């Protein structure tokens, strides 16, 4: 079985969000499962530099101008790059300029990605042809549409990582992207009078996956579907929408081997975690004290992530003697709020604005609780890292958070399945009640250790996801 992933980011070469983490790990896990897997990406500068052995395998004239298709390897995975310097050779973000304005030609830049994905199934590389073309998020959303227009030379899967981004462009661009106008209607890629790359993927794919089972259900409901609930309900009823959880790349996130930690540990040597906490308290300007629980946030500071709730609940957390370490950036109002809290409570609140991958490991290794109070969360990786590191996740019951964390209720403790703390309603009172439950468990050290060991024993490896995808592909062929 030959599978081609079509996407716009690849960790560690180019990352703006969780999509890159998925594509940095899933293909290698699929290869280990015996699936011949390759990845197609635009030839962005960081990717060109990272795939150093890439060679030209063909050249084509397209609606987007003259392009070359390159092929090389990165971390043992075959990588195709679309070499079109007039479209992709730009510094900084792959999506917008330095003033944060989306590039005016994004419609062409990402239509080309979908077109090449489709042409791969029709023999663009004469030596390798995919049976399954697996497209990710709106950037690759036109891939299934081009496949449909070509008579479906391969089966297509479209994965929704975040339904909030729809890839919307004016209708007149239909003349520029090589698709028939007959596709521009409600039963096609039209959405609110414009072209939606995301809707194209949802409508034309043979199967849609979301990045968790709960998110796959949620996106059939109006509050999560952004106007696409009708189509998604239909696909769900046809058995063409399902959820497969993302995994954790254990080569990168594993406290037993993590060289970014002051002290490495396993579920059997959890006492070694204490040194990481001490070092984190020092680094964040917190009072060194192993008797108080250290809560942490590693997140974009947005209301989607529920960080306004953390700010509102913070006085209650501090009153009970807890500490907070925060790493993140985003909404200026939230940034100012957390910086003000740090100034008002020195030794109890430590804030670092920005994002540093290495420091996020130190927080995960040193904190006791990781807060993920999202209003919606398609899958979420932060809580999975928390489970892996014995840093108990405190989450809202939504999306992938609901699928991965079991509340430390009396019943779950008795059944041996507790792995963190879960709250229902998206308000500060509900969050604060969960924080109080964390303090209650903290006051019982042997029980806390029991839940840590339970959390660290859970398997969210990419191997599990790779098996699920292979079963899906086999059903389609």
UniProtKB/Swiss-Prot annotation:
Pathway the protein takes part in: Glycan biosynthesis; glycogen biosynthesis
EC number: 2.4.1.21
Annotated binding of ADP-alpha-D-glucose, by residue: 15
Entry keywords, A to Z: Glycogen biosynthesis, Glycosyltransferase, Transferase
MF terms (GO), sorted A to Z: alpha-1,4-glucan glucosyltransferase (ADP-glucose donor) activity; alpha-1,4-glucan glucosyltransferase (UDP-glucose donor) activity
EC top class named in words: transferase
Region forming the signal peptide: none
Catalytic activity: [(1->4)-alpha-D-glucosyl](n) + ADP-alpha-D-glucose = [(1->4)-alpha-D-glucosyl](n+1) + ADP + H(+)
SS bonds (residue pairs): none
GO process terms (BP): glycogen biosynthetic process
This protein's record includes keyword Transmembrane helix: no
Gene Ontology CC terms: cytosol
InterPro entries: Glyco_trans_1, GS/SS, Starch_synth_cat_dom
Record PANTHER family: ALPHA AMYLASE DOMAIN-CONTAINING PROTEIN, GRANULE-BOUND STARCH SYNTHASE 1, CHLOROPLASTIC/AMYLOPLASTIC
Entry similarity comment: Belongs to the glycosyltransferase 1 family. Bacterial/plant glycogen synthase subfamily.
Cited NCBIfam families: glgA (TIGR02095), PRK00654.1-2 (NF001899)
Name used for this protein in its record: Glycogen synthase
Gene of this entry: glgA
